[in-house]
Amino acid sequence: MGEFNSNLYKAMSICDGSFRYIEEFSRLYTFTTENISGYIDYFDFDNKSLLTVGSSGDQVLNAFYSGARDITLFDINGYTKYYAYLKISAIISLSYKEFILFFFKYVDSPFERNKYMFSKQLFNKMKDTLRILDYESYLFFDELFSLYDKDIIRSRLFDDDEDRCVVIKGCNNYLKDEESYNRLKSIIRKITFRYVNGNIFDSDINGKFDNIFLSNLCTITSLERLKELLKKLDENNLKDRGSVLIGYLWNTHFDENNYKDNIKEVYKMPITREVLKDYITESHSIIGVRDILWEEEEKRDLVLIYRKK
């Protein structure tokens, strides 16, 4: 319980206003900021395994929805496991409408905060299930909801960058509509995933996987460091004929040969394709997050994929 006690103490300190405990990756994302629905069909999850990063837990839920059955969630944020189990217990315990009311910041209007967000009443409906699923996750959130106002928890432990309701639904197959949500509800008790807290760049990872999702890590590191990570994963963790989501890039509808010098390195596509030429075997333009919002089909976002032979 040593690591758990440390995580809870830090979370409580942040809620109390001791912001010196806030680290670079200490905030959770309530939902994915990627259009997972736009790229998940490029991967085979039918009874396959997945290693993924992502503090929102949505990579885990969408992969399980698509057939994955052996999932490892690897993330630098120590609260990631607790939040993933909170979502799973909510899916088991709450209706589609209740889930939306509990987790979404905006429901009816992007200018009016949802007053039921992190409702103690809705938490009480799911907390017995959470206790059964993962006792540490139950203790973590039960303590926080007992001590702090819901708005304090949401504003201080979670990133404030949450999109509109229609975008979140569009990015997640399991939230697309009530039928999809209920389909996941009917099978989610079978979900098992392993959580590992650590820095994927520096840590040794146990196991071999059919699929690996690196999410948007490519936007927060150098191309050379990303190349080293891909080499490590390819040699030690990726099965033959396995696939890696190397990176997710937003708003890539510009001419990739004409970019601004001050953009992040990975967006300089001629350089990226050269440095990662041994790994980028496919790239796909997909319906972007902004496209979902404006109901357009510009395919503004880009995914980079590696297929191992």
Where are these regions (language model features)?
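A short SAM/SAH-binding and catalytic strip from SAM-dependent methyltransferases
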Residues: 210-224
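S-adenosyl-L-methionine
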Residues: 2-46
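Class I S-adenosyl-L-methionine
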Residues: 256-309
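A short acidic, Gly/Pro-enriched loop at the edge of an enzyme's catalytic core
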Residues: 201-213
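A short glycine-rich, Lys/Arg-flanked "PGG" loop and its adjoining helix->strand segment in the class I
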Residues: 227-240
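Conserved class I S-adenosyl-L-methionine
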Residues: 47-56, 71-72
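Conserved beta-strand signature within the Rossmann-like core of class I S-adenosyl-L-methionine
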Residues: 213, 240-253
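Class I S-adenosyl-L-methionine-dependent methyltransferase module
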Residues: 2-11, 79-187
